[in-house]
Curated annotation (Swiss-Prot):
Region: Sufficient for transactivation activity, residue numbers: 165-195
Species of the source: Mus musculus (Mouse)
PROSITE patterns, alphabetized: BHLH
Biased composition (Low complexity): 1-18
Residue ranges of coiled coil: none
UniProt-reported outcome of changing R195G: Low transactivation activity
Listed GO MF terms: bHLH transcription factor binding; DNA-binding transcription activator activity, RNA polymerase II-specific; DNA-binding transcription factor activity; DNA-binding transcription repressor activity; E-box binding; histone deacetylase binding; identical protein binding; protein domain specific binding
Full protein name: Twist-related protein 1
SMART domains: HLH
Gene designation: Twist1
InterPro entries reported for this sequence: bHLH_dom, E-box_TF_Regulators, HLH_DNA-bd_sf, TWIST1_bHLH
Subunit structure: Efficient DNA binding requires dimerization with another bHLH protein. Homodimer or heterodimer with E proteins such as TCF3. ID1 binds preferentially to TCF3 but does not interact efficiently with TWIST1 so ID1 levels control the amount of TCF3 available to dimerize with TWIST1 and thus determine the type of dimer formed.
Organismal lineage: Eukaryota, Metazoa, Chordata, Craniata, Vertebrata
């Protein structure tokens, strides 16, 4: 009887049953692996959305994981570039303030130079007028004289010539030595006469 059992071939039904029993055992590890993969992918997606810079990392780095060294370097570079831009903007603002402060200073300097030039011109004109007024007091003039500066200088030159001629003559030495006031009056009168004669002779000659 034992020989019949051992030697009897396995029926197809029994083989199918054994295969069907082994298939669930194989499917169970495969399904377990798939579940583990789904859990890992869900954890990665959750970490990428909740992590700091996840959106920027997804947009910039593409498939890089959040918090990776490459993403950290890129974040540092972008932060450094922003800081440099801010520093450049600050430098530009400083240059604008310096140029804006320089233009009013130059305008004030020009105004100061103009004021100083006007003051010097007024002082020069005032001193010149005072000198001509003193010269008119020295030169004997007629009541009808309204001399300009050039005419005053010409009359002064003629008066110097007249005084030279008086000093060369010997007739008025004894008469003018008596009184200086009388001498001055006589000189003024003589100069007026000499001047009128000279003007008459000049007009007659022309």
């Amino acid at each position: 009887m034992m020989q019949d059992v051992s030697s009897s071939p396995v029926s197809p039904a029994d083989d199918s049953l054994s295969n069907s029993e082994e298939e669930p055992d194989r499917q169970q590890p495969a399904s377990g692996k798939r579940g583990a993969r789904k859990r890992r992918s869900s954890r990665r997606s959750a970490g990428g959305s909740a992590g700091p810079g996840g959106a920027t990392g997804g947009g910039i780095g593409g498939g890089d994981e959040p918090g990776s060294p490459a993403q950290g370097k890129r974040g540092k570079k972008s932060a450094g570039g922003g800081g440099g831009g801010g520093a450049g903007g600050g430098g530009g603002g400083g240059g604008g303030s310096s140029s804006g402060g320089g233009s009013p200073q130059s305008y004030e300097e020009l105004q100061t130079q103009r004021v100083m030039a006007n003051v010097r011109e007024r002082q020069r004109t005032q001193s010149l007028n005072e000198a001509f007024a003193a010269l008119r007091k020295i030169i004997p003039t007629l009541p009808s004289d309204k001399l300009s500066k050039i005419q005053t200088l010409k009359l002064a030159a003629r008066y110097i010539d007249f005084l030279y001629q008086v000093l060369q003559s010997d007739e008025l030495d004894s008469k003018m030595a008596s009184c200086s006031y009388v001498a001055h009056e006589r000189l003024s009168y003589a100069f007026s006469v000499w001047r009128m004669e000279g003007a008459w002779s000049m007009s007659a000659s022309h």
